[in-house]
Amino acid sequence: GSVQSLPNLVPNYNHPEPSPLGLEKAAAMIRAADKPILLVGLGTFWDNASSSMVSLAEHLGAPVLTTSKCKGAIIEDHPLRAGCIIGGLIERDLVSKSDLIVTIGLDAVELQPKGWPYPTKVLSIASHPSLDGLVACNEEVIGNLDSILKILRTIVPKGNDWGYDAAKDFRASVHKALDTPSTGLSPQHAVEIARTILPRDTIATCDAGASRLLVVQKWQCFAPRDFLTSNGLGSMGFAVPGALAARLAYPEKPVIAFTGDGGLLMAVADIQT
């Protein structure tokens, strides 16, 4: 018989070229800022822009907060890595100290669905226009994130490195806030022990639920896409099948799943088979 090719179902989406005017407006906002902060989302992975994002952060001396799904975009022992932003209170003090919020590939679905609490100016760098309205931006540059970040790196001056101490202080405050007393093995200590024992290239999966907020702050990730979690819709029962899939895709890497009783029982049949 004959073989017939089917049409490609994946759309061929090309990023628009960033406008020179948009780039100049973005650069002007960065030049005017003394304390910029980078809020980095999953779009950074889609455009393979992790390296250029870190390069810009180092050039500006700006602290970096990533969303849960974007852990590993900046290695988590980097001095400018502050932690994860969830849209809650834990990161509010750090973000409020900045005088310019630069969102990079940020999908507001990863944040809590409530009003944006910061009066600070926002510069959005995105691959497509932000239509959700949850994060109101003063300026937005649209295009390939890797290209935009590389261009901005060359046209803005070096920053004052305020982010090194700011990120360090934030990490210390998060550690203190999560280090609650326990008579036995606490969840946070279990995560810390796992991170100490397991190799640096371990892939971690994490279920939805309150425990996820702890894991995303305590577990350290050292490469893009080495931390997999169900965020946005936040469906439970993800961690175990996610870990099995990760192991099949990367049999040479160790994999760990962080889950609770509900998430485990929803997927326990996957372990049986």
Annotate each predicted stretch with a short phrase.
Residues 42-127, 223-253, 267-269:
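Glycine-rich, anion-gripping cofactor-binding loops and their flanking helix/strand elements
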